[in-house]
């Protein structure tokens, strides 16, 4: 097959002029064009890869910065903002008189806030409220005013706060009660509504928690033997002021402002760090100082430093010998002649010849005849 191709080529171009001046330049031109196209394609692929890599890095940096800003605000909100309220049921207890089957003592209860050391936040003001659900019975309507007292005690049962407040049911005239009863009678019949009033009694308006003596127990007492009630609950509500008030009442606005501020400061720190790390001169100097410090602690380096100091001493001795030789000869010597005249020979024991012995040696005349 190869022989046949060669014969065909020889028959078409016996002198090789076509191959030399037509085919070979065309093939070379084609290869050159192919190489250029391929190099440009590789460059484009490289630029596309670099562009994708840069975009990926920028996207990662943006996501990381936004996540850090959100995380910082969430962590600050979790640490700075306390729980808005704590609710505990109050189970009243009293002693019953055997003759009349009525309470002989005031209803009282012990409420355990927490088994831990602390429930409330130090420095935050709280409102302590006792809610009493009282039916609109004739006995409660005739009861009038009564007192509700509460004691705040710490883990060691030490008294940390005591307060009493008066309360009563809200007055409604017989006509208003009759009209409301007729209007709401379907709800009363279906059981969707009951005839009772919730009487809130604010025991403490601004109670402040102590760091050394946190409150763990509350003792509640209603100073009335004729009172009738369904349930009693204890509410401890945080009274926010200042920044906490803004963060609680306008959470979206405060979150936007705080996250934007965090983004600004994080971007400033990021740009300063980028500018600082882009200049590698200080890093190179630190590496050199660290290398010098680590090498100075190595015994081999210490030995080399000691040997260099000895070499410096030898140079000083040689220089002094040059000056001595110049003084003895009385003529001005060049540095080369002085180096030739200074003969510092070491014996096998490592001793030097003294300068006096060197002065006794015959010196050659270095002055030129004029």
Curated annotation (Swiss-Prot):
Annotated disulfide bonds: none
Which UniProt keywords are present, listed alphabetically?
Endoplasmic reticulum, Lipid degradation, Lipid droplet, Lipid metabolism, Membrane, Signal, Transmembrane, Transmembrane helix
Provide the membrane topology annotation. Multi-pass membrane protein
Q: Could you tell me where the Basic and acidic residues compositional bias lies? A: 350-359
**Mind telling me what this protein is named?**
Seipin
Residue span of region Disordered: 346-370
Which Gene Ontology terms describe the biological processes this protein takes part in? diacylglycerol metabolic process; intracellular calcium ion homeostasis; lipid catabolic process; lipid droplet formation; lipid droplet organization; lipid storage; phosphatidic acid metabolic process; positive regulation of axon extension involved in regeneration
* Cytoplasmic topological segments: 19-55, 273-370
Using the record, list the residue span of the signal peptide; answer none if the entry has no such feature. Answer: 1-18
- Where are its TM segments located? 56-76, 252-272
GO molecular function terms noted in the UniProt entry: channel activator activity
- Keyword Transcription regulation listed? The answer is no
Q: Where in the cell is it found?
A: Endoplasmic reticulum membrane; Lipid droplet
* Gene Ontology CC: endoplasmic reticulum; endoplasmic reticulum membrane; lipid droplet
Keyword Protein transport assigned to the entry: answer is no
> What InterPro entries does the database record attribute to this sequence?
Seipin
- Description of the deletion phenotype: Flies are viable and fertile with no noticeable behavior defects, but display reduced average weight. The size of the lipid droplets in larval fat bodies and the fat cells of young adults is significantly reduced, but exhibit ectopic lipid droplets in salivary gland and gut. Flies also display greatly reduced total glyceride levels and hypersensitivity to starvation.
Q: In which tissues is it expressed?
A: Widely expressed, with highest levels detected in fat body, moderate levels detected in salivary gland, midgut and muscle, and weak expression detected in brain.
Identify the residue ranges that face the Lumenal compartment according to the record: 77-251
Q: What does this protein do?
A: Acts as a tissue-autonomous lipid modulator, preventing ectopic lipid accumulation in salivary gland (a non-adipose tissue) and in promoting lipid storage in fat tissue. Required for the growth and maturation of small nascent lipid droplets (LDs) into larger mature LDs.
The domain of life is: Eukaryota
**Where this protein primarily resides, as one coarse class?**
endoplasmic reticulum
